[in-house]
């Protein structure tokens, strides 16, 4: 076949294939154009999820008749100077969107320049039959797109159901609206209003907060930490959720570079790393984070849809984002999700109580009875007492802490005011600590709480150059489920040795352990090694040292901590609460579960109609 030039309409249809994938792509390009046009109000109207009709109206600067005629040609733009290609501050700059959309639809554009006497209109069908006429219109621009993909029926066949396409469009509008809280947005579908967002005109932080409430929800703000982080050429602001407020997917993560919504793997990995100490691997935080960076340090001209970016120094950006998120979480370190307490109160409103069953016995810290035995047998009671649990008791024997605990018992009223988690009143089911503050009741999961304390302590311990090990009097032989798990541990033996664990292969699927970290005390070695093998076997030989340390720390912390089913004295309970108050991120264990919930007295009173 002879080589020949493609026609202009064919070129535009090919370009549309890169830029326009679905109705949401059209809405994204046209709404971003409206934002670039200094609009303060943008209205979107859809029919059949945009397949039949898309209308975008704005009150921006508008266009003259000559600008209107040029705007629908390829590679025409008013948004940047050719001499300043590395300093792009607008959404659009390629000059591809309008001609690409026009090539696959029936387009009508009506526009009036600000302070102009006349409005003008241009009509295109499949990118052809361009005709500019005088029209009547308010200041700004209105673009109507009908019969999307009529000129490319093959693409039309690949569109999803209306519900799916509409959801994609709503997501696009929400992201743009989050980045521009001063602009009012409305979205209507088949006559039904789906979004109505009022523009905010206060200070930047207040504007952003209100827009996030309107788009993501007030519940998120109540359970989120505010980020405010700056360097000379970089700034990060926004909100990120407390670890206990999480999701099963990353869909609710909104990340922006210079107000441009991006799906960048570097940023997603940084977010994951920032939460690795606080969330299970199958849970994801919610966030709306905005990074402002010198345009010359980021390349947005990587992908036609501009969803991906390239940083001049990616590691620098990654490390700054991790630091910013960790700082924000640390400042909100003792706060657990408010929704957990709300859910608990909802259950109280409709209790599922068996009237035949007696109320379970509660251990009162003021009771002198020593003959209490749990009514329910727990296999955990057969596990040897952990050396670290004894350390917690030993810590209390120090004169200073002893005196502190005595003072708190003697001056309970003062304790309620002075300490966030209050004074311990009872232990429920040898698992939960009930404490009282000035205006609330706090229920603490003793295992989850001590696991967080242990996690932070062991994390610091593993950073020390000289790890103290204890040699087992009798080496422990641990038989694993299969040879793969045994090989996995053996493959990592040198790294594990540096983390305080000495082991060797013993047969096909067994490991012999000769030394363990001293901090673990009288730990159940069998269970420790089995759990560690389960953690590591999914990763094989290629796991990074940082990930290995994370897995080892989690496993150590779980075996280090006080178990459910262990009776605690008043002194031990109060000591645990005080340690929580002084430990970063003690509101959740390292799996993202809450360590305590707080029930406000006013909410409890409402349950009783007071």
Swiss-Prot record:
It comes from the Bacteria. GO terms for biological process: mismatch repair. InterPro entries: DNA_mismatch_repair_CS, DNA_mismatch_repair_MutL, DNA_mismatch_S5_2-like, HATPase_C_sf, MutL/Mlh/PMS, MutL/Mlh/Pms-like, MutL_C, MutL_C_dimsub. Gene3D superfamilies: 3.30.230.10, Histidine kinase-like ATPase, C-terminal domain (3.30.565.10), MutL, C-terminal domain, dimerisation subdomain (3.30.1540.20), MutL, C-terminal domain, regulatory subdomain (3.30.1370.100). One of its GO terms (cellular component) is mismatch repair complex. The keyword rRNA-binding does not apply. It holds the Pfam family HATPase_c_3. Transmembrane segments: none annotated. One of its GO terms (molecular function) is ATP binding. Keywords: DNA damage, DNA repair. Belongs to the DNA mismatch repair MutL/HexB family. This protein is involved in the repair of mismatches in DNA. It is required for dam-dependent methyl-directed DNA mismatch repair. May act as a 'molecular matchmaker', a protein that promotes the formation of a stable complex between two or more DNA-binding proteins in an ATP-dependent manner without itself being part of a final effector complex. HAMAP family: DNA_mis_repair (MF_00149). This is DNA mismatch repair protein MutL. It comes from Rickettsia africae (strain ESF-5). The gene is mutL.
């Amino acid at each position: 076949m002879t080589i020949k030039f493609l026609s202009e309409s064919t070129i535009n249809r090919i370009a549309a294939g890169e830029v326009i994938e679905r109705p949401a792509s059209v809405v994204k390009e046209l709404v971003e154009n409206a934002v670039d046009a200094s609009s303060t109000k943008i209205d979107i109207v859809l029919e059949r999820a945009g397949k039949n009709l898309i209308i975008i109206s704005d009150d921006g600067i508008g266009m003259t008749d000559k600008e209107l005629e040029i705007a629908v040609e390829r590679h025409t733009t008013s948004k940047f100077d050719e001499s300043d290609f590395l300093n792009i501050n607008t959404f659009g700059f390629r000059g591809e969107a309008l001609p690409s959309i026009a090539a696959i639809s029936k387009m009508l554009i009506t526009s009036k320049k600000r302070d102009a006497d006349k409005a003008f209109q241009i009509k295109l069908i499949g990118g052809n039959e361009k005709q500019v006429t005088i029209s009547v219109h308010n200041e700004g621009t209105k673009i109507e797109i009908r019969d999307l993909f009529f000129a490319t029926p093959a693409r039309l066949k690949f569109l999803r159901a209306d519900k799916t396409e509409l959801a994609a469009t709503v997501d696009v509008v929400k992201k743009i609206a989050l980045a521009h809280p001063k602009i009012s947005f409305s979205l209507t579908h088949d006559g039904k209003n789906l979004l109505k967002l009022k523009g905010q005109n206060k200070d930047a932080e207040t504007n952003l907060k209100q827009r996030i409430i309107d788009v993501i929800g007030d519940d998120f703000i109540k359970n989120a930490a505010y980020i405010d982080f700056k360097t000379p050429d970089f700034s990060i602001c926004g909100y990120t959720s407390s670890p206990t407020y999480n999701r099963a997917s990353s869909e609710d993560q909104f990340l922006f570079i210079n107000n441009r919504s991006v799906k960048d793997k570097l940023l997603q990995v940084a977010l994951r790393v920032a939460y690795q100490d606080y969330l299970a691997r199958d849970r994801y935080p919610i966030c709306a984070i905005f990074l402002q960076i010198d345009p010359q340090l980021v390349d947005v001209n990587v992908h036609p849809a501009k969803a991906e970016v390239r940083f001049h120094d990616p590691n620098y950006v990654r490390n700054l984002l991790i630091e910013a998120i960790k700082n924000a979480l640390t400042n909100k370190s003792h706060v657990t999700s408010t929704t957990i307490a709300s859910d608990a109160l909802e259950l109280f409103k409709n209790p599922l109580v068996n009237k035949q069953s007696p109320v379970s016995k509660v251990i009162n810290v003021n009771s002198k009875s020593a003959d209490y035995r749990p009514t329910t047998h727990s296999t955990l009671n057969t596990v040897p007492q952990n050396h670290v649990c004894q350390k917690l008791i030993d810590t209390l024997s120090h004169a200073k802490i002893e005196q502190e605990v005595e003072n708190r018992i003697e001056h309970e009223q003062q304790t309620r005011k002075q300490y966030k988690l209050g004074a311990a009143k009872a232990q429920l089911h040898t698992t939960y600590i009930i404490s009282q503050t000035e205006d609330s009741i706090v229920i603490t999961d003793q295992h989850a709480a001590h696991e967080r304390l242990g996690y932070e302590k062991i994390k610091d311990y593993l950073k020390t150059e000289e790890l103290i090990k204890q040699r087992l009097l009798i080496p422990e032989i641990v038989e694993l489920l299969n040879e793969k798990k045994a090989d996995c541990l053996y493959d990592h033996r040198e790294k594990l040795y540096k983390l305080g664990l000495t082991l060797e292969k013993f047969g096909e699927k067994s490991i012999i352990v000769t030394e363990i970290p001293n901090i673990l005390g009288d730990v159940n070695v069998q269970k420790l090694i089995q759990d560690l093998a389960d953690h590591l076997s999914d990763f094989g030989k290629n796991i990074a040292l940082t990930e290995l340390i994370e897995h080892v720390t989690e496993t150590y912390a779980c075996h280090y901590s006080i178990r459910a089913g262990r009776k605690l004295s008043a002194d031990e309970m109060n000591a645990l609460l005080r340690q929580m108050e002084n430990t970063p991120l003690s509101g959740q264990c390292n799996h993202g579960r809450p360590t305590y919930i707080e029930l406000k007295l006013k909410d409890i009173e409402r349950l009783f109609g007071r």
